[in-house]
Amino acid sequence: MTEQNPAAEEQQSAPRRTIKSFVMRAGRMTEGQQRGLEQGWPKYGLELADGLRDFDEVFGRSAPRTFEIGFGMGHSTLEMAAAAPEQDFIGVEVHKPGVGALLSGLVSQKLTNVRVYSCDALEVLRDCVADASLDRVLLFFPDPWHKSRHHKRRIVQPAFAELVRRKLKVGGVLHMATDWEPYAEHMLEVMNVAPGYRNLAQDGRCVPRPTERPVTKFERRGERLGHGVWDLKFQRID
């Protein structure tokens, strides 16, 4: 799945270029994706420029709320939202084909518990989501940036952990999954020392595969190649 950029530091002098943990790819949209964008965006789309939102007002109710960073083509988002109509989902993706695909699915399934941003997810977290308002934050199969010189691009960094912690309710959970073991180790290194979190794994490492996480193409691909998948859950405790 596509992932997003680390939280930008506050700028007090001349602007500095923010390191991005995603690359904007020029993907051509199918007719179905374009149709989904045109038909679905007016109902499901939200704009970063609108700033801080009251999501109870956006959804027309108060319900458990999940924020998904980088939903890719939206397959997992659709499956989770359809399986849990009593919950609300905010999905963010930078790549337009994926946004169009998810919107097409939302329109065809007539789901009402999903809203979509098409921009940098951590800018949405920072500017549009109230503190202590999310029950879950999902980060499934982010780009591992394999090369050492690119590790600074990995989304899971101390600043990311703190931003997510602020947006989670006390008791809320950050759920991450990766099919790249070195990235799982990196996630553990960052999160096990991040203030205000508790690792939900009994051994202080990874949790068994959660039943609520849909099987993704990344997971199926990894299984074919003999790779494992590592799930990590960290709960906000203060």
From Swiss-Prot:
Its EC number is 2.1.1.33. Pfam families: Methyltransf_4. Keywords: Methyltransferase, S-adenosyl-L-methionine, Transferase, tRNA processing. GO terms for cellular component: tRNA methyltransferase complex. PROSITE patterns: SAM_MT_TRMB. InterPro entries: SAM-dependent_MTases_sf, tRNA_(Gua-N-7)_MeTrfase_Trmb, tRNA_methyltr_TrmB_bact. The active site is at D143. Pathway: tRNA modification; N(7)-methylguanine-tRNA biosynthesis. Gene3D superfamilies: Vaccinia Virus protein VP39. Substrate binds at K147, D179, T216, K217, F218, E219. The keyword Transferase applies. It catalyses: guanosine(46) in tRNA + S-adenosyl-L-methionine = N(7)-methylguanosine(46) in tRNA + S-adenosyl-L-homocysteine. S-adenosyl-L-methionine binds at E68, E93, D120, D143. Catalyzes the formation of N(7)-methylguanine at position 46 (m7G46) in tRNA. This is tRNA (guanine-N(7)-)-methyltransferase. The gene is trmB.
